[in-house]
Amino acid sequence: MARMKARSAKGKRVAKDTWKSKVWYDIYTPQSFGGDVIGQTPANDPANLIGRISEISLRDLTNEHSKHMTRMYFKVDGVSGNNATSQFVGHDTTREYLKSQVRRRRSKINAIVEVRTKDGFKVRVKALVLTAVRARDHHKTEIRVRMEQIIKEMAKETPFAEFVHAMLMGGLGSKIYGDCKKMFPLKRVEIFKSEVIEFGKAAEAPVEEAAAEEVVEEAAAETQE
């Protein structure tokens, strides 16, 4: 019995610590968003980084406390050394914040519209209008139609980076508010969510390690499938 136990112990495999082989990479926003570091992520192969999503609050990115409820998402699209580049792929707003804005005897009007920016990016935009008093159905319809028109017009006339800035920093919401308040008393406008569906011609080319260029491109293709 003792010999059998010794043999069993000798043949036992030791689990490999994969963390020791991992390297930490800094994730950077696109230059159009300041080129700032927004986080770190580990990987044992640069190709494994492609397609990873990094999240950061707009408050942390801009140092504006009033933007704490907005979360931005960036997808890694390239690697150079220990640095990973990324593309903005969308944003959302915390559910708690949106619920806190809804009051009794007010109407909530939602608009979901897909637009294409001046430089070819296709974006799905979700906007919300809260009226100051309860609105009738025909007022809701008129406001929703005008919301969609404003969003489409701004996207068509604006490059992607500027359009995203308008969504996140209030420019688009202010435009909707200014136009629609002439139709009915409003309380607030929120561009509460966006999603990039297609990248346009102005998308920044990812920077990749020369030695890993082919494998990184293959990983990117697999991610899109």
UniProtKB/Swiss-Prot annotation:
InterPro entries: Ribosomal_eS1, Ribosomal_eS1_arc, Ribosomal_eS1_CS. GO terms for cellular component: ribonucleoprotein complex; ribosome. It comes from the Archaea. SMART domains: Ribosomal_S3Ae (SM01397). One of its GO terms (biological process) is translation. Keywords: Ribonucleoprotein, Ribosomal protein. GO terms for molecular function: structural constituent of ribosome. Transmembrane segments: none annotated. Signal peptide: none annotated. Belongs to the eukaryotic ribosomal protein eS1 family. HAMAP family: Ribosomal_eS1. This is Small ribosomal subunit protein eS1.
